């Protein structure tokens, strides 16, 4: 038990105080404002607080915070205080973004020191989303079962605050965070099917709190995973017999609630366990038996309910066989397929037919959800037919074309790892025709007339970035570059998920 506590306390050694005074510094809110501007979507029009925020509003907010009871932005202020009643949402957005910048400081300093200690010069190479898929392609083709887990999102507010206490020792900041969460939780969080949907005005703070909570949960899983290869072997006579399974379960639960983790470790000796998390989902894949996967399922349910005090329904964890299951992950639909090949072997006068089955990891783009996202962004209707997108009257033709080109290239860049490009061709067709209809609507002309005016050069502008790069690398072998483009291409410079991909 002491070893386990030491493992959890290892990354908490750097603790920082006196974060509360930073709330009264204007540059903190300027940093938050710049962060939102740099990361705003090019797909959706959003008149968020970055269009309304100004230094005058920030100064007014800081002035009010100096006054007594200034941080009470509740609904009652709409009657008692017209100023806050009119700008209630705007002030809460500015405050939450600024507070998120402050509480991220201890984590940022810890990350920098960790990278310096490990002598990692280019940490951005480790953050690419596409780097996950070569790992899955290399590992999952050798595994048999997968646990598809939907994380519980009904987390008590006090649990989130208690998690931060290990990192932030500033009591004033924690009290302020507790008050802010209790005031705004219901208005800023909208529970959806599986995960909470944070309001577009306040995503950074709540994503930070949720991820810090997930970090606490994953530290225990990582400890079990790292220790599993060093466990002593267990007798298989009783351990794997189904008749004694429920007896072992009772002992396992008692050991867990007594915090005796050494008994728990006996249950998880699996060098082939792999774990990946994305938003409110996580995947645990293993080469072991269904019985072993059921033990992991039971452990996860009890871990969330009795350690994190969050209700976790067993139905939110599904055990599936990889060869018959598709994983929706990061905008891709991944699966392990068996490719059969028949080989005829001739030995003297005898001939043999050998049937070889090879596992192959495939990733495709699910077209129906992607068309749904295009429909929400007003590029097409629900059936996938392109429509004109409303634009401002002062937008030039070059600005409209450039915006559509950036969207098309970003989507092609992100989905370059698809093993089948047919879905991408359809998406490019929708964006291209939507661009033409938008321009024709602006100039009050028909689509056919406007296409004749633009000519074939307009269609060539929608040539994807991958095709251009490969044509430069293989200028004399066009067929080679085309064949490479049709294959899977993973990039190491993708650090964020497209809003059109994030359709869940």
From Swiss-Prot:
GO terms for molecular function: RNA binding. GO terms for cellular component: chloroplast. The keyword tRNA processing applies. Its main location: plastid. It holds the Pfam family MatK_N. Disulfide bonds: none annotated. It is found in: Plastid, Chloroplast. Keywords: Chloroplast, mRNA processing, Plastid, RNA-binding, tRNA processing. It comes from the Eukaryota. InterPro entries: Domain_X, Maturase_MatK, Maturase_MatK_N. Usually encoded in the trnK tRNA gene intron. Probably assists in splicing its own and other chloroplast group II introns. Belongs to the intron maturase 2 family. MatK subfamily. This is Maturase K. It comes from Calyptranthes pallens (Spicewood). The lineage of its organism: Eukaryota, Viridiplantae, Streptophyta, Embryophyta, Tracheophyta. The gene is matK.
């Amino acid at each position: 038990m002491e070893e386990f506590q030491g493992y959890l306390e290892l990354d908490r050694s750097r603790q920082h105080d006196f974060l509360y005074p930073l709330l009264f510094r204007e540059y903190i809110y300027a940093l938050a404002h710049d962060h939102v501007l740099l990361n705003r979507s090019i797909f959706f029009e959003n008149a968020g607080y970055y269009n309304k925020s100004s230094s005058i509003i920030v100064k007014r907010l800081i002035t009010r915070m100096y006054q007594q009871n200034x941080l009470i932005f509740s609904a009652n202020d709409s009657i008692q205080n017209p100023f806050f009643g009119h700008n209630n949402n705007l002030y809460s957005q500015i405050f939450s973004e600024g507070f998120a910048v402050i509480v991220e400081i201890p984590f940022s300093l810890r990350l920098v020191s960790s990278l310096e200690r490990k002598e990692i010069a280019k940490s951005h190479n480790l953050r690419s989303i596409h780097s996950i898929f070569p790992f899955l392609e290399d590992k999952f083709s050798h595994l048999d079962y997968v646990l598809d887990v939907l994380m519980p999102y009904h987390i008590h507010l006090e649990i989130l605050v208690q998690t931060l206490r290990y990192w932030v020792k500033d009591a004033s900041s924690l009290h302020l965070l507790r008050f802010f969460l209790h005031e705004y939780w219901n208005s800023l969080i909208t529970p959806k099917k599986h995960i909470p949907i944070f309001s577009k005005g306040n995503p950074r703070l709540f994503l930070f709190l949720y991820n810090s909570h997930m970090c606490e949960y994953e530290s225990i899983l990582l400890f079990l995973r790292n220790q599993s290869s060093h466990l002593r072997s267990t007798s298989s006579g009783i351990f794997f017999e189904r008749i004694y399974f429920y007896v072992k379960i009772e002992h396992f639960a008692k050991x867990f609630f007594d915090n005796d983790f050494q008994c728990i470790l006996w249950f998880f000796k699996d060098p082939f366990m792999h774990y990946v998390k994305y938003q409110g989902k996580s995947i645990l894949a293993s080469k072991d038996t269904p019985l072993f996967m059921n033990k992991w399922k039971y452990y996860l349910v009890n871990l969330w309910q009795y350690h994190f005090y969050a209700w976790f329904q067993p139905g939110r964890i599904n055990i599936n066989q990889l060869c018959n299951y598709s994983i929706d992950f990061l905008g891709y639909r991944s699966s392990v397929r068996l490719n059969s090949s028949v080989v005829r072997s001739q030995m003297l006068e005898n001939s043999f037919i050998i049937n070889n089955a090879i596992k192959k990891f495939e990733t495709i783009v699910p077209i129906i959800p992607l068309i749904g996202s295009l429909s929400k962004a007003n590029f097409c209707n629900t059936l996938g037919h392109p429509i004109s997108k409303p634009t401002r009257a002062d937008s030039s033709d070059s600005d409209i074309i450039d915006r559509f080109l950036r969207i098309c290239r970003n989507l092609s860049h992100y989905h370059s790892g698809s093993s089948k490009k047919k879905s991408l061709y359809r998406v490019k067709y929708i964006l291209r025709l939507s661009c033409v209809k938008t321009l024709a609507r602006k100039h009050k002309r028909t689509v056919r007339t406007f296409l004749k005016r633009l000519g074939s050069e307009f269609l060539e502008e929608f040539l994807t970035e991958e095709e251009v790069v490969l044509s430069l690398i293989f200028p004399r072998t066009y067929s080679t570059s085309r064949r490479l483009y049709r294959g899977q291409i993973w990039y190491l410079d993708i650090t964020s998920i497209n809003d059109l991909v994030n359709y869940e």
